[in-house]
């Protein structure tokens, strides 16, 4: 499976020196910044572990792009999809990873997981569950961070069970899925043998601002 991922210059050196690169839990920005992100990242890690057993030395998977705006030809996409800040080298790697080691998901719907929201099939179900939460005087955040109350844990599980919809990358429901969707990929690590190509991008302040507007 052809994937594209962006790494820093330091990470590229680690890959060259160690022959592999995996997520450093201590440096992983999102799950360490906000507890809902940590819950979502752990959810993704657990799902990947179901199809490809996690190495003991890894906590979270690495991310890559499989499809952007409906296209899997990502050689010439907007560099904004790869570059996180200007005036810094970004190494874009084209990878070929065994599809049995990759978990694909809808990038748009993934944000529901990151923000702690359920993913329902239609507006009526959305509204009904919102009303239910209001009657319970319960916020989504409070439900997802709960660890003891059995009744709230049932609600937490109900919410997280809806997140499986992100893995239906061929879904057609217009309430959930866009026509030209973006699909992300997760896997445990990058090894030198799966790297097909390397491209270095370094955008100036002006180029970076322009890429954000494209």
Enumerate the language-model features and the residues they cover.
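Short polar catalytic/cofactor-binding loops
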Residues: 7-14
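Short hydrophobic-aromatic micro-motifs
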Residues: 3-6, 64-65
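Glycine-rich loop/turn
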Residues: 14-66, 70-74
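Conserved NAD+-utilizing ADP-ribose enzyme module
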Residues: 2, 10, 19-30, 58-60, ...
């Amino acid at each position: 499976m052809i994937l594209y991922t962006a790494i820093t210059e330091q990470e590229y050196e680690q890959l060259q020196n160690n022959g592999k690169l995996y997520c450093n839990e201590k440096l992983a920005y999102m799950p360490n910044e906000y507890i809902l992100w940590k819950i979502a990242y752990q959810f993704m890690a657990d799902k990947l572990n179901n199809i490809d057993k996690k190495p003991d030395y890894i906590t979270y998977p690495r991310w890559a792009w499989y499809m952007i705006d409906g296209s899997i030809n990502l050689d010439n996409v907007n560099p904004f999809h790869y570059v996180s800040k200007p005036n810094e080298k970004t190494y874009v790697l084209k990878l070929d990873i065994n599809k049995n080691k990759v978990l694909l998901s809808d990038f748009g719907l993934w944000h529901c997981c990151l923000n702690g929201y359920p993913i329902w099939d239609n507006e009526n179900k959305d509204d009904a569950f919102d009303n239910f939460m209001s009657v319970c005087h319960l916020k989504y955040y409070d439900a997802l961070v709960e660890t003891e109350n059995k009744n709230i844990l049932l609600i937490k599980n109900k919410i997280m069970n809806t997140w499986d919809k992100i893995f239906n990358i061929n879904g057609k429901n217009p309430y959930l899925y866009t026509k030209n969707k973006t699909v992300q990929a997760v896997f445990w690590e990058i090894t030198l043998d799966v790297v097909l190509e390397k491209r270095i991008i370094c955008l100036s302040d002006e180029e970076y601002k322009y890429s954000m507007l494209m």
